Amino acid sequence: TTGGTYSSTTGLSINASTGAITPSTSTAGTYTVVYTIAASGGCSAVSTTTTVTITTSAAATISYTGSPWCKTITTSRTVTRIGTSGGTYSALPSGLMISSMSGSIIPSSSAPGTYTVRYTIAASGGCAAVIATATVTITAAPIASISYAGSPFCQTITTGQSVTQTGTTGGVYSSSPSGLSINASTGVVTPSTSTAGTYTVS
């Protein structure tokens, strides 16, 4: 029978005439909805009930401090999560060693690169799945070797003696003990302005 009215316990946004519910303006919770047909034609009023539930949508943010991380780091890097718990972690592209449950990352077991970490909360209670993201970077450990051809050098040599360097560039040169005339940027050694002796260049 049509023509009845709808009502519910407090907190549910419901149209009394149509029974239409607006979840966005309702408070999360479980409600009893009553449809009542007034007494008429000598018949008593009739009512029927049903239950509806409004769930709170999941929400979360994630972040990692200290990125980029060098691949030499063997201790776990932990995630900071704010919001809904119970989600799972993943990363794109492949190559990042990450715990799907805790979100912890182990740089030393990861391939160098930049990754998007995803924290996914599954769809539930009529609400869509929620995904929070963060970006992390793993950098390759610098590797280099150096050598000087022709050493030992006679102290009478006035021309600079160049270094042969392989691997990562951009470093600075130094020596010990003191007494070696070396260019910190290029690694060039000048024997004539150096003190005779044996030096370690690094």
Give the location of each predicted region:
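Solvent-exposed, low-complexity, repeat-rich "mucin-like" stalks and linkers
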Residues: 1-7, 50-90, 139-174
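Short, intrinsically disordered, charge-balanced linker/junction segments flanking boundaries
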Residues: 1-3, 198-202
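Solvent-exposed strand-loop boundary residues in beta-sheet-rich modules
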Residues: 10, 41, 85, 93-95, ...
